[in-house]
């Protein structure tokens, strides 16, 4: 029987590029906040040792699919014959900066860690997650996090109760191209971790994306009438924070017909946080 598990989106409340390693990876500082908008990952255990993707994502082969790769990565730690069928219900846009693919992969790791009775501790599961991509460990970490390094050095950080209006411009932003852009500044001074405030920092990738994708700038400008609007990740999604659900929903109701978006609540912990032994 299939079981359903949420894969929540993330927002980068700020994202600073503070340097670049010799291997080309960028050194970052960011605060990651999970929100209650989510994909759903359906898992059905098998005893034939096979990992089967049910339904294809457009343009994503099975070998590239992060959910399949996550299951394959954990499988050697499981009992012989452990397998799984994987099906995704996508609500999060691809190429939107909400971490949907990374979150889907993390949910597979978190859920199968329990369902396959692997019971790896969180730090070991995060190390596996990093092999799938720089954004995957934060979803396994499962809390609002101050991130450094390439995004894998994580510390828990308190964040206020917040509701977010998230707008989804109709463009797909390729992350690698934005990080490779010659106009990207890579020398933002590093911050010391401190009590987080909503106006802290900025997103170094935002000017690059706005310069290449004017639709993102148009959405930022509209949302900026109501609060401090920012881009998450490498875009294209943009967001603003509000103290109450009513305030956020009143902004969403004013959204022009030419734009799309949603309201989401900030989460303090991942819904599957307790699936991992400490």
Swiss-Prot record:
- Gene Ontology annotations of biological process type: isopentenyl diphosphate biosynthetic process, methylerythritol 4-phosphate pathway; terpenoid biosynthetic process
What residues make up the catalytic site? Answer: 10, 135
This protein's pathway reads:
Isoprenoid biosynthesis; isopentenyl diphosphate biosynthesis via DXP pathway; isopentenyl diphosphate from 1-deoxy-D-xylulose 5-phosphate: step 3/6
Which residue ranges does UniProt annotate as crossing the membrane?
Answer: none
Organism's domain of life? Bacteria
**InterPro entries with a match to the protein in the record:** GHMP_kinase_C_dom, GHMP_kinase_C_sf, GHMP_kinase_N_dom, IspE, Ribosomal_Su5_D2-typ_SF, Ribsml_uS5_D2-typ_fold_subgr
One Gene Ontology term of the molecular function aspect: 4-(cytidine 5'-diphospho)-2-C-methyl-D-erythritol kinase activity
> By its UniProt entry, which Gene3D superfamilies does this protein fall under?
3.30.230.10, GHMP kinase, C-terminal domain
Q: Coiled-coil region(s) at which residues? A: none
Q: Which residues bind ATP?
A: 93-103
List the EC numbers from the record: 2.7.1.148
- Quick check: keyword Nucleotide-binding in the entry? yes
Catalysed reaction(s)?
A: 4-CDP-2-C-methyl-D-erythritol + ATP = 4-CDP-2-C-methyl-D-erythritol 2-phosphate + ADP + H(+)
Query: May I ask which residue range the UniProt record assigns to the signal sequence?
Result: none
Its keywords, alphabetically, are: ATP-binding, Isoprene biosynthesis, Kinase, Nucleotide-binding, Transferase
The UniProt entry, under Pfam families, shows: GHMP_kinases_C, GHMP_kinases_N
Q: What does this chain do?
A: Catalyzes the phosphorylation of the position 2 hydroxy group of 4-diphosphocytidyl-2C-methyl-D-erythritol.
The family this protein is said to belong to: Belongs to the GHMP kinase family. IspE subfamily.
Q: What name does UniProt use for this protein?
A: 4-diphosphocytidyl-2-C-methyl-D-erythritol kinase
